[in-house]
């Protein structure tokens, strides 16, 4: 009975996501003609989103770096590897992410590991429904740019090494049709209570577009690994709750983040280039009213390999991680770490598909379910903060 009710909604979600891809394929792309969430400054090493080109820093960007004690040349030469707690920038306004040309080559991307946000217990009481049955993750159809264009991988560096998450291109209401916004999890950009902002954050839409195996990807051409290029983040916002308490059970319901990425030199916006972006649903419907939710991402922890996009579809249930904290969505899903930050989508009453959450946590020691935050006023404030900064 459960699967019979799920099927129509599941098919609708998959179909709706496919229909978000309207641009040319990556080889056909024509030439380009601040709340509950904390604000953050950032800067690029060049005027180009990937660092390509010879333009230098603007005075404004250079001043921002100087105020935060960042010497650009020393940073590019390896100073970014210094994770000393006393100098690790962590406050809302401290985010800096200078581009380092050529840093994220295919080999470095392959070596990136996934963070492992898990939880061993839930709060007792009426805020958690029975554990959902596992839903086996399905491989997304290839090429990804035709079937799930808004979905991609986020690469970054942490004290533990090269890391990877998932992310989704979302619409910018102040730049209709020209968004440069990417939605992900807070723990994919900031270490939370015990640390600061991660570094060298870049987004790769439709990573491994043809779904090649890890061994085949080792010999792939760059355009097969990142068909639309790389988009370095030049601004980031996460929730104040995550910055102050991230990594504790009290913070998981606030585990979301918004990135602004800068297009490559002379190119159109991220949305125009990829041809896809999803609206965000900030109505925070109760799990029982959210209906079928689809989660997309690139799971990396065993039994997955991190290079293949997967999806799960299930009806949302309730989960709480600590007393007096907001309820989270939970679905049955066998995706593992690496899918963190990947978008959760639902079909709205008007028939449109919208992002309603992102992958935050899973169970310690197994891979049967995922949980994500409800996106309400705090999440909307974070989204608005980035949108307003880049309006025009």
Residue map of PLM features:
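C-terminal cap/linker of serine protease catalytic domains
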Residues: 266, 365-392
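Secretory targeting and sorting signals
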Residues: 1-28
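N-terminal low-complexity, Pro/Thr-rich disordered segments
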Residues: 21-144, 392
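Conserved catalytic-core segment of clan PA serine endopeptidases
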Residues: 139-149, 155-158, 170-173, 190, ...
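N-terminal carbohydrate-binding/catalytic regions of secreted carbohydrate-active enzymes
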Residues: 92-206, 214
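Catalytic nucleophile loop of clan PA
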Residues: 334-358
């Amino acid at each position: 009975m459960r699967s019979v009710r799920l099927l129509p909604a599941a098919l609708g979600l998959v179909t709706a996501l496919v229909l978000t891809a309207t641009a040319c394929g990556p080889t056909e792309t024509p030439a380009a003609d601040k709340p509950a969430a904390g604000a953050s400054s950032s800067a690029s090493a060049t005027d180009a989103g990937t660092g390509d080109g010879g333009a230098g820093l603007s005075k404004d960007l250079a001043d921002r770096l100087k105020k935060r004690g960042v010497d650009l040349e020393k940073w590019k030469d390896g100073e970014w590897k210094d994770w000393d707690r006393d100098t690790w920038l962590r406050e809302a306004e401290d985010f800096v992410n200078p581009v380092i040309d050529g840093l994220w080559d295919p080999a470095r991307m392959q070596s990136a590991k996934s963070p492992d946000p898990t939880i061993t217990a839930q709060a007792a009481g009426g805020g958690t429904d029975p554990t959902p049955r596992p839903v086996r993750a399905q491989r997304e159809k290839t090429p990804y740019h035709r079937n799930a264009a808004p979905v991609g991988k986020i690469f970054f560096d942490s004290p533990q090494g090269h890391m990877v998450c998932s992310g989704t291109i979302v619409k910018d209401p102040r730049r209709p049709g020209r968004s440069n916004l990417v939605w992900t999890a807070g723990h994919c950009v900031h270490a939370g209570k015990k640390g600061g902002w991660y570094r060298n954050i870049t987004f790769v839409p439709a990573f491994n577009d043809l779904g090649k195996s890890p061994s085949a990807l080792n010999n792939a051409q760059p355009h097969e690994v990142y068909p639309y290029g790389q988009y370095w983040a030049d601004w980031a916002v996460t929730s104040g709750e995550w910055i102050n308490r991230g990594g504790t059970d009290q913070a998981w319901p606030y585990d979301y983040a918004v990135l602004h990425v800068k297009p490559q030199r002379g190119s159109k916006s991220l949305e125009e280039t990829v041809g896809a972006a999803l609206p965000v649903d900030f109505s925070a419907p109760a799990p029982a009213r959210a209906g079928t939710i689809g989660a997309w991402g690139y799971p990396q922890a065993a039994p997955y390999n991190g290079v293949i996009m997967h999806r799960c579809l299930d009806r949302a249930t309730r989960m709480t991680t600590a007393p007096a904290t907001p309820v989270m969505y939970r679905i049955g899903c066998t995706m593992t770490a690496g899918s963190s930050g990947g978008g959760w989508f639902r079909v709205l009453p008007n028939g449109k598909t919208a992002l309603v959450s992102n992958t935050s946590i899973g169970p310690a020691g197994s891979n049967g379910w995922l949980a994500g935050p409800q996106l309400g006023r705090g999440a909307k404030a974070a989204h608005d903060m980035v949108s307003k900064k880049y309006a025009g």
